[in-house]
Amino acid sequence: MSADVPVTVAAVRAVARDVLALELRHANGQPLPGASAGAHIDLALPNGLVRQYSLVNATGQATMDCYQVAVGWDANSRGGSVWIHEKLKVGQALRVTHRATCSEMAPEHRRVLLLAGGIGVTPIYAMAQACAQQGVDVELWASARSAPRLAYLEELKALLGQRLHLHADDEQGGPMNLTERLATQRWDAVYACGPAPMLDALTAATAHWAPGSVRMERFKGAEQPASERQPFELVLQRAGLSTTVDAHESVLDAMERVGVDFPWSCREGICGTCEAPVLEGEVQHLDYVLSPEERAEQRRMMVCVSRCGGGRLVLDI
């Protein structure tokens, strides 16, 4: 979905320390387009920002009465979470500008482990509901810095019972030991969402697992050190345009600077919306969308984060 949908904030409630849950309903009272578990929406805020939030209640319905999202407080954010926590009120008019699914569940996976860290529980909670509805054998490990920060705790307990395993870092003396817990592959797949250290640990702990059995959603893409960024020439073949991408800007920034309106959503390398075909150039892939095989082909890139390792990049745009 790419057309704007006007929504109204119907309810706001706290679901954990520093986590607010929002209930969004169509401004005209109509049903909202449905979505599969793992989907997110782009929410346009009155302060001009557009932010992505996972749909907590998306389980594959054709239509939905409301969209439910949760927003964690982040003092270092670019303004989205702070505005919602400090300014948002019931009755506020907002716009949903896009809906997409980055981590759709595979139907062939019948024994599933869900792994959530912090606010990463939002898409994972939706997946847990979908698994329960579809009769999938599911287990969920949820972790947070402290127990009061575990969002949707009561709902998860009611849904999963003994299949829910909780981990509070402050009570356990540190993060969950995934290397020890995942030494043996007992599931068809793991779906995970959480902070980078948790997902990096998951990647290392499951390196011996079957390819494609670990799927994760990150909060943001990888960052290339400033010292490694070099300017390069960007050629947009079909548009007949060329420009220099400076060290401090992205390919997407440069495209917009020369007047090319290209679709994007996250600007973090995690959603796949800004995928572009590559005709020439050595791509430095910094996204979390493409597989290692797709990266090696050097045929496409996410222009919001990935760069060129040589002096010239030619895109089929």
From Swiss-Prot:
Key word Iron-sulfur present: yes
Ranges for domain 2Fe-2S ferredoxin-type: 230-317
PROSITE patterns, per database record: 2FE2S_FER_1, 2FE2S_FER_2, FAD_FR
GO biological process terms on file: catabolic process
InterPro entries: 2Fe-2S_ferredoxin-like_sf, 2Fe-2S_ferredoxin-type, 2Fe2S_fd_BS, Beta-grasp_dom_sf, FAD-bd_FR_type, FNR_nucleotide-bd, MRET, OxRdtase_FAD/NAD-bd
Recorded coiled-coil stretches: none
Known cofactor(s): FMN
Domain of life assignment: Bacteria
Domain FAD-binding FR-type: 2-108
Function: Iron-sulfur flavoprotein carrying electrons from NADH to the oxygenase TsaM. Involved in the toluene-4-sulfonate degradation pathway.
Subunit description: Monomer. Part of the p-toluenesulfonate methyl-monooxygenase complex TsaBM, comprising the reductase TsaB and the oxygenase TsaM.
Protein name: Toluene-4-sulfonate monooxygenase system reductase subunit TsaB1
Species per Swiss-Prot/TrEMBL record: Comamonas testosteroni
Taxonomy of the source species: Bacteria, Pseudomonadati, Pseudomonadota, Betaproteobacteria, Burkholderiales
